[in-house]
Amino acid sequence: MNEIKTIKKGDANIDYGIIHGGEKAFIMLPGISLTSILNNIDAIEVAYQEILKEYTIYVFDHAMPENDDFSFDELIDYLIYAIEEIGIKKACIYGVSIGGMISLILSYKKPELIEKMVIVASAAKTNVERLKVLKQWEEMSNNYDIEVLNRDFFTTMFTSDYVSKNKQSLDMFIHNGSKHECECFSRVIRTMYNFNILDNIKNVNIPTFVIGSELDPIFGRKASEEIAEALGCDLFIYKGYSHAFYDEAPDFKHKILKWLNNK
């Protein structure tokens, strides 16, 4: 049975889920979303059945301190604290979008925790101009335009074919969220502006697989290529998918597991 637990550090709650599977640890650091990914932990279990044959999955929600100017350093400190409290000695790290950014920082701040790393739809260098989509979402969340934000989020993240096939899910999804969640969402987005750790990761020596999409409207193909070049690691670029290819591409989980087993 899946578990959801909380670790407290200072004024922040670090929420995480455990999806029991194999003996090895697989830490999932998700991308941004208006509501908690842990609301969908049962769906994650279904989607990642192939991974669960060999790994137990630990899904971390992003710790949410209430201060308006919190940073990536704080997010990393909370994550390291939680991993050590849980007692995970070494894990495969799987980071999506902002979760990939956090994973990359972890790779040079606490490399001993990481056995292998999969970086998905992410970036090691950003600026406000490069993140026009996120800037729009920040403005929507600041205005508490929950329905508009959710609709734009869904239609930006996924291909038009996926959206049309899942219209019923979209109609259920667009009303989810609260004013407080909008404020947290906006704070997380702001941490992603003017981010640059390309030089920091050049000396990282952890087996890494970077996966991106040529049609990613948030980071673009180039961001994945920059990470792979800095790390000197394996790279795969999907064609025909948007940012959330990790939910759409039918071979995605198999591709990850095959890489993990070959490294």
Which role fits each region the language model picked out?
Residues K8-E66:
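Conserved HGGG/HGGXW glycine-rich cap/lid loop of the alpha/beta-hydrolase fold
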Residues A43-E45, Y55-C92:
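Active-site loop/oxyanion-hole signature of alpha/beta-hydrolase fold enzymes
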Residues G95-G99, S103:
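Gly/Ala-rich beta-loop-alpha elbow adjacent to hydrolase catalytic centers
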Residues Y108, E115-Y144:
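Flexible "cap/lid" loop of the alpha/beta hydrolase fold
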Residues V128-L131, E147-N200:
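Conserved alpha/beta-hydrolase catalytic His-Asp/Glu region
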Residues V204, V210-G212, D216:
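Short beta-strand/loop motif that positions the catalytic acidic residue
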Residues P217-A223:
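Conserved alpha/beta-hydrolase "acid-adjacent" motif
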Residues Y241-K253:
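Catalytic histidine-centered segment of alpha/beta-hydrolase-like enzymes
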